[in-house]
Amino acid sequence: MIVNNIFSRILFGILASCCLLACRGELPVLPSDGIEVGKDPLGGVHIKGMYLLNEGNMGSNKCTLDFYDSTTGKYHRNIYAERNPSVVKELGDVGNDLQIYGDKLYAVINCSNFIEVMDVETAQHLGQIDVVNCRYITFSNGKAYVSSYAGPVGIDPNARPGKVVEVDTTNLAITREVVVGYQPEEMVIKDGKLYVANSGGYRFPDYDRTVSVIDLKTFQVIKTIDVAINLHHMKLDRYGRRYVSSRGDYYGTGSNVFVIDTQTDRVTGSLGIAASEMCLSGDSIYMTSVEWSYVTESNTITYALYDVKQNKMVSRNFITDGTEAEIAIPYGVTVNPETKEIFVTDAKSYVVPGYLYCFSPEGKKRWKVRAGDIPAHFAFTTKTFQ
């Protein structure tokens, strides 16, 4: 009898486990408790929170996704793994861009060669777009546009030109592609034209120095604008000017930000400011720079604020309380478009978890929290985190 009773309990346990496993897909997502960091004291109306993509060091497969819920004041780490336990290798190797379009969240996973598409409210996997060595993503009229190095990762003086790929956001199918300059980076869209900054970073020391202009109707390159070597980021202000950052060559030519008039597609000047990362919010460009020099074998770090309406430098350091002394490697910067709170990430040594800092609009530290490895890319959402 005792043996039969034990056997019955074991059998019941096995059947119960099988039942739970069979129903796993129907179970609701249970979010982590999160870490209390503080609610938004300025009370944003529409924005509910912010996603943060942690790049992860190349080759480590440690790209992760975090979420700051400004309605509860809680920070949730590594939510993709939590909400997608069946996805092999989770997010992949080196997250390079993060954007929201409609009800979808798009994470560009550079060295894994795909764009991960998620539900913007739950961060649950919806689909994947395969693009070799993908870099940045932007959107217009139901289409996504992805810049691609179009070849393997690595320095190569004979690296092939890159491309821009068009994707239908309804079915995530690639519809068109066009060849541009070498190692294309960030893009902006204006008046039916897409502008992409070409770096030529793999072709050192023979960098590219152009912006390719694509007609979105024909999807052909209609113009090439000569700007400066090793271009990277691009932002568009409300006055019809584009701001393009150049990394320089890390020797005699320093980093700078160049201004292009959208009416004439000509370079009209430069800001004389180094910029590794840029965020345009209203009439202000926030720029962080970690400018490495092989001559001095050291970094020069700056936190600049520039007024695009008045065309003048506001400050060489938008952090006003001395907190910059805590930050080893400023790696990402963004500004809440409603509250104007400033967010800066610290990559530390690139191989350990970094930190996210929140500053008041006046540049005073509100809080900081540990993030993933190399925290870098942001996306604000008006949707409630489920």
Describe every region a protein language model picked out.
Residues 1-2, 234:
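Intrinsic disorder/low-complexity signature
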Residues 2-11:
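Bacterial N-terminal signal peptides that target proteins for export
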Residues 19-22:
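C-terminal motif of bacterial Sec signal peptides marking the signal peptidase cleavage site
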Residues 24-386:
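Predominantly soluble domains enriched in secretory-pathway, periplasmic, or organellar proteins
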